Regions:
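Active-site-adjacent betaalpha module
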Residues: 4-8, 20-145
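Short beta-strand segments at enzyme active-site cores
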Residues: 11-17
């Protein structure tokens, strides 16, 4: 999804949950030539870290595509806070994960019950493209092959 963001000129904000203790985001992600904004946090919800919330607001978007690690904790709390702030939230189910599958599914079910739209990566990408005549159709298609 991050590479698709680069291709489609979609802003990307990456958070790292306590990288000193849990490790940093992979260089494969950070070094994508999109220059994503990478910010550290210790809160579970992105919106509870002022610097990250300000970075999200600065993008001027009302639709947020969300994915990440610990679906049932960080992703869930972020999604719920985004909804409260008036954002339209789309979770990429197959780009998110929890250590336990049961927690992942419970987090997804809870988000869905709160109005978060649950998509797969492929569904999201083709909804963004709308048509095979989109100028970046081939590039996006190659990402999912």
């Amino acid at each position: 999804m991050i590479e698709a963001g680069r291709i489609l000129d979609i802003p990307v904000v990456i958070s790292e949950q306590y990288p000193k203790g849990l490790g940093q985001t992979s260089n494969q992600i950070i070094n994508i030539p999109l220059n994503p904004i990478v910010l550290e946090k210790t809160t579970f919800s992105l919106l509870k870290t002022e610097e990250i919330y300000n970075a999200i607001k600065a993008q001027g978007k009302k639709q947020i595509i969300l994915f990440g690690i610990e679906t049932h904790i960080c992703v869930l709390q972020t999604a719920l806070d985004l909804i409260k702030e008036g954002y339209e939230v789309y979770l990429i189910k197959n780009a998110s994960k929890s250590r336990k599958e049961s927690e992942h599914e419970a987090g997804i079910n809870h988000m869905q019950s709160e109005g978060i739209k649950i998509l797969t990566l492929e569904i999201a990408l083709f909804e963004l493209l709308k048509s095979s005549t989109h100028p970046h159709f081939k590039e996006i298609q190659n990402l999912i092959k």
